Every structure is written in C-alpha cells, then in structure tokens.
Amino acid sequence: MKIAVKSGVEQLSLFENTAFPYYEAYLRLDEDLHALLDTKMKLVALHMPSMIMTPRGKAGVDFAQEGEVADACFRKLEELLLFASENGVSYIIIHLGFFNSFRETREDVLARVAQRFNKLSCLGVKLCVENVPRWTTLCFEHEPLLSNVEHLTLFQKMCPAIGVTLDIDHLAIDTVFGYFEEGFRDRYIFESDRDRFQLIMEQEMMAQTRNSVALFTEMIQSRVVDFFEKIQPDTIHAVGSDFCNYELVEGKLPLRGEALPLGHDGMVQRMMVVDRIDHKIWLSRIRACGLITLELHLRSDYDYIRMMKENYEFVSSLIP
C-alpha cells in the first residue's frame, strides 16, 4: 500500500525539499501533463479537474449532463487514461456528476452514465469514482450522484470495472446532511427564497451538531464501519473533519471544518476547529486499498508541510 500527498500544480514547489515518495495530482485543466512527471515524487494518481472546456467555454465537470459537457468530460478522461497508461500512473479519480432529484431518479441517471463508462478502454489504469457529499449548495436540483456507500454499490453493479475512492471527510459531511435531508426537502419545496434557505439549513445543522456531539460522532463512526463492510475502496483520501464547523466562510469552499489535517486541534479562520474523526476506525478496516492520499487544504492557519509530515507518520504507523 502506498501513501501519497495530494497536490495541485501550484503547490508542487512546496514539496521540493521533502522526502514524500508519491503524490496525487489535482488537475486544474490547462497544465502540461508531462511536467507532472518532472518531480522527485512519483506521480501515482490523477484527480480529474473540476472544470472542462466545451465549445461554449468552461463548464463544471459532469459526466451525467448530456450533450457537449459530457462529451468534453469523456474526451478529457480518455486523454488522461492514455497519459496515465503510457507513464505508469495507476489511478484516475473522478467526481461523476449531478442530477435534479425533483425531476430524475438517481437509478435512471446512473444507468445512462454507466452505459458510456462500460464502453471505455481504461488501458490498465484503475478508474475510481469518489464519494461527493450533499450539502446546502449541493442538493435537490443539483445533487451529487454518488454520495454514500449505497450509491457507490449501485453504480458498481451497473459498471463492474469501476473502482472507488473513499474520501473520509466527504463521508462525514454527507452523513450530517443526510440526517437532516428529509426535513429540509419538505420545507425547501415551498421556499421562495432558496438562497436564504441554504443559510438557514447551514445554521440549523451547526446548532444541532454542536448540541449533540456524541450523537453525530457515533453516527459518523457507524457509517465508516458500514462503508467498509460493503465496499473495500481502491484508494482513500485521508482528511480531517469537524462536523461542528461545517460552515461556508465568505461563500467559498471548503467549509471551515472541512479538509483539515488529521488530528487537528486549533484555529481555522478565527474559530477553534477540531478533527472529530477517529481515523483508527477506518485504518484498522483496510483490506484491499492500494493508495492512501493525504489531503488537506492549504491555509495560513497551520504549517502545511509540517502537517503533511505529521499525517504521513500517523498513517504509516497504523496501516496494516
């Protein structure tokens, strides 16, 4: 099993004087792929960019959106598969896309998308779909197709060759939103100011999670155990998460309590934030994972490289 760091192209220079052996590249769209090979770290995974170029300009990556967006996504994916195959890159990780849950069923959209994925030639590269959490800005009319283990299991039945990337932080975020979703959906339908209601949802979730820390801790731990009982992921994104601080700051992702160093206990954007995930639970359940990627957001609140080193030592000490 390999342990990698996740880096955008802009952050690669930060790792020049480190001894990390492997990295997963988070692509932005316009980089020279071959330049990613010119590093001391070995490139072992590509994370598909969040944007894609279409004949009408940039658009968000969404394999489920029919027409030119999906066509552009598959063209880019085929380019990445060829590059990965030719250069010994083992994994490509993608976010599958979104659907309008008021107009379509998840099953119908996944079945349509799976037909096209089943025609892909992956050239010996493992293509993995990542769990993407539902949240106030990613729900209902624009809901991720693959948010939890049930969704991933369904897609694997339709597309047997597909691999899975489990993002621990995303699992926690989706677990919290899932607890409130039914009640929010009933109110959302009749809400005229939906932007305002997104803020209300966030405020209500923060209030309840802070008042019921033990409940949500147990809930997330249970979902982690359930995930590993149903799927052994091919790769894992190891990320800290504070479910008491899932809050957009100045309207920008990541959430304050998202994408934290493992075991973090300190200030983030002028608030005290604590990683509330018991990472020993998932680390002890790994059986077939080939890659663990350390992922944390580059913030001024902590020493990014030092946190990466500490996280690397922590995970190394606990992997089976």
Language model features with spans:
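Gly/Pro-rich active-site loop or hairpin
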Residues: P55-A70, C139-N148, L171-C289
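Hydrophobic, glycine-enriched assembly/anchoring segments
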Residues: C289-P320
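Acidic-and-aromatic substrate-binding clefts and catalytic sites of carbohydrate-active enzymes
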Residues: S7-L36, I52-R56, D62-A64, E68-C73, ...
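Glycine-rich loops and low-complexity Gly/Arg-rich segments
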Residues: R28, E68-A72, R116-K119, H151-F155, ...
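N-terminal pre-domain/capping segments
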Residues: M1-E86, I162, Q198-N211, K309-P320
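Hydrophobic faces of well-ordered beta-strands that scaffold small-molecule active sites
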Residues: K2-S7, P21-A25, K42-P49, I92-I94, ...
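Short amphipathic alpha-helices and their capping/turn segments at secondary-structure boundaries
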Residues: L27-V44, K76-E86, L110-K119, N148-M158, ...
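Active-site acidic/histidine proton-transfer and metal-coordination neighborhood
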Residues: G57, D62-L166, A172-D174, Y179
